[in-house]
UniProtKB/Swiss-Prot annotation:
Organism in which the protein naturally occurs: Nothocricetulus migratorius
Modified residues (Phosphotyrosine): Y4
EC number annotated for this UniProt entry: 2.5.1.18
Enzyme class: transferase
UniProt xrefs under CDD domains: GST_C_Pi, GST_N_Pi
UniProt name for this protein: Glutathione S-transferase P
Protein's gene: GSTP1
Subcellular location: Cytoplasm; Mitochondrion; Nucleus
Length: 210
């Protein structure tokens, strides 16, 4: 039986980064898919610590909060930088990813039609910090921090991929980010996952947007 279980809705949402991570690291996991109807009944929600999903199980350890799950996997699988300095930078990057993801989620679920144009116009300003970080690390030809992949790379990759769906061409003026996405997406296990039916057929969000 796989050591990990992801309990989540039938969307990519806040779990696709951890799925990409697990796939790239050669880990197996079980999916427990929760439909909106099941969630609406309230019995599962009442058992969730914060009343929300995802819920993640690693043996007898149960975790909530997607970024806590990513950090746990980072520590468990050696994806948290090579020292405390790099770990601090990985945390910083991941917090930046979360900031932009929250903006994206707000757009998708509260003001998509009326807010998309303004969001896309502001997007370059939100992407620039990641381009800057890449430029300061081996000329942008490695990972976002150091010379080994971290959980923040997987989270950033997922964030950039969904923004390419939202705004095709959004990375055209960010050559390092564009090359970064291509480079990570070409890693054999990530490439296989991104082309798998599980990923391709899973909607990004739960309301039909993207």
């Amino acid at each position: 039986m796989p050591p990990y279980t992801i309990v989540y809705f039938p969307v990519r949402g806040r779990c696709e980064a951890m799925r990409i991570l697990l796939a790239d690291q050669g880990q197996s996991w079980k999916e427990e898919v929760i439909t909106g109807e099941t969630w609406g009944k309230g019995s599962l929600k009442s058992t969730c610590l914060y009343g929300q999903l995802p819920k993640f199980e690693d043996g007898d350890l149960t975790l909530y909060q997607s970024n806590a799950i990513l950090r746990h996997l980072g520590r468990s699988l050696g994806l948290y930088g090579k020292d405390q300095r790099e770990a601090a930078l990985v945390d910083m990057v991941n917090d930046g990813v979360e900031d932009l993801r929250c903006k994206y989620v707000t757009l998708i679920y509260t003001k998509y039609e009326e807010g998309k144009d303004d969001y896309v116009k502001a997007l370059p300003g939100h992407l620039k910090p990641f381009e800057t970080l890449l430029s300061k690390n081996q000329g942008g030809k490695a990972f976002i921090v150091g010379d080994q992949i971290s959980f923040a790379d997987y989270n950033l990759l997922d964030l950039l991929l969904i923004h390419q769906v939202l705004a095709p061409g959004c990375l055209d003026n960010f050559p390092l980010l564009s090359a970064y996405v291509a480079r990570l997406s070409a890693r054999p296990k990530i490439k296989a996952f991104l082309s798998s039916p599980d990923h391709v057929n899973r909607p990004i969000n739960g309301n039909g947007k993207q």
